[in-house]
């Protein structure tokens, strides 16, 4: 709903006024339920000032959404996050405390609470990330300790950050201490399929996808529970919350 959204969408396009461009800046947008309902219904949508919420312009929601999609097709960006959906899907103990996800990183794999929390403290989301190389699936899927080792490595990195964090990043340290968030993703799935001459959109590719991620999810959850038993739970937000 930002008044400058239309120009913002085009900042990476090499055409037009070069002084209004940022070709090397990666950007993203948040799409609300309100906007998507306007797109669905073919309604107009108000663009409002983020400062005082005054209406600065009214646009055709479908035309704006089409422009966004065409810009993604041409430039690969902006990234898109459906922020109302993200907040609906937050863990229940976060929702019960009134925590809110305001935004994410561009790739949108990190969706953690930010801003002022229920204890009156400011948070800056922190999450340690790593990727498993699916191209080498055959080398590690039978090793029962492999994913546990990666999860342990991520938690060690997070603890090292907490121990070393200077006062200037107190909000980030606080957030890391409250949740101890880590993320284990993948890369190389396309290379995995190519090595087996499996079409990307085939039923076989879908079957492998489900098999691989089921394996990773189960092992990662086992490792998380093991780490909790060894090192204790992350800081509990309050007595009503869950581990």
Tell what function each PLM region has.
Residues 34, 67, 188-192, 208:
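A general alpha-helix detector
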Residues 7, 130-131, 180-195:
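Contiguous, well-ordered alpha-helical segments that form the cores/surfaces of helical PPI scaffolds
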Residues 149-173, 177, 196-243:
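Internal maturation/activation junctions in enzymes
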Residues 146, 181-185, 216:
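Short, contiguous, pocket-lining structural segments
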Residues 1-139, 143, 168-174, 220, ...:
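Active-site cavity-forming subdomains of large catalytic enzyme subunits
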């Amino acid at each position: 709903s930002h008044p400058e959204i239309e120009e913002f969408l085009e900042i990476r396009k090499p055409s037009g006024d070069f002084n209004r461009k940022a070709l090397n800046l990666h950007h993203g947008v948040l799409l609300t339920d309100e906007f998507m309902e306007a797109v669905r219904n073919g309604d107009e949508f108000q663009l409002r000032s983020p400062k005082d919420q005054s209406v600065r312009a009214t646009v055709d929601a479908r035309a704006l959404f089409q422009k966004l999609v065409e810009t993604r097709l041409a430039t690969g960006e902006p990234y898109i996050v459906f922020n109302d959906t993200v907040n609906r899907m937050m863990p229940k103990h976060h929702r019960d405390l009134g925590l809110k996800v305001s935004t994410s990183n561009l790739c949108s794999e990190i969706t953690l609470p930010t801003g002022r929390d229920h204890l009156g403290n400011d948070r800056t989301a922190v999450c340690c990330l790593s990727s498993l190389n699916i191209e080498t699936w055959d080398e590690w899927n039978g090793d029962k300790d492999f994913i546990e080792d990666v999860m342990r490595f991520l938690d060690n990195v997070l603890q090292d950050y907490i121990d070393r964090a200077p006062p200037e990043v107190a909000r980030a340290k606080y957030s890391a201490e409250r949740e101890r968030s880590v993320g284990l993703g993948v890369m190389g799935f396309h290379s995995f399929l190519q090595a087996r001459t499996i079409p990307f959109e085939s039923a076989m590719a879908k079957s492998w996808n489900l098999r691989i991620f089921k394996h990773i999810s189960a092992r990662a959850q086992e490792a998380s529970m093991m780490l909790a038993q060894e090192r204790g739970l992350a800081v509990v937000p309050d007595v009503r919350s869950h581990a």
